[in-house]
């Protein structure tokens, strides 16, 4: 008689091979609020012009652990005066196991920032409000679309580069 083994018996623990992603921690890594034109700026009659810039970075922090940092810079100006400037780096540690290498960049540069953004937005809004300025609510950002746009630009750039000579 021969013994038959099922597919389930060939793996010691099938769940060990499934992709797993978990948010381990999220935190303010760096926060700066500057109010260089106080107290005169509070008497200015007009609303400040707001400029918002953001950047996303990721790095491996350990085995199966990645840090994703969302940097937000907000500058409010009235004429040639700076009403306030906020620089925030809000980061998260993500545990990632059994995810194919080609799927890491979309997660680290699109999905992870999407998860962090609401919390970073609140920290920035609180800092601005605590500086005695009208609270600023940042509009949601479509990080997935931005990632796709950047990936397409990089592909187009790579294709436009002349091939090296052998």
UniProtKB/Swiss-Prot annotation:
The keyword Cytoplasm applies. GO terms for cellular component: cytoplasm. Keywords: Chaperone, Cytoplasm, Protein transport, Translocation, Transport. GO terms for molecular function: unfolded protein binding. The keyword Nucleotidyltransferase does not apply. It holds the Pfam family SecB. Its main location: cytoplasm. It is found in: Cytoplasm. One of its GO terms (biological process) is protein transport. SUPFAM superfamilies: SecB-like. InterPro entries: SecB, SecB-like_sf. One of the proteins required for the normal export of preproteins out of the cell cytoplasm. It is a molecular chaperone that binds to a subset of precursor proteins, maintaining them in a translocation-competent state. It also specifically binds to its receptor SecA. Belongs to the SecB family. Homotetramer, a dimer of dimers. One homotetramer interacts with 1 SecA dimer. This is Protein-export protein SecB. It comes from Rhizorhabdus wittichii (strain DSM 6014 / CCUG 31198 / JCM 15750 / NBRC 105917 / EY 4224 / RW1).
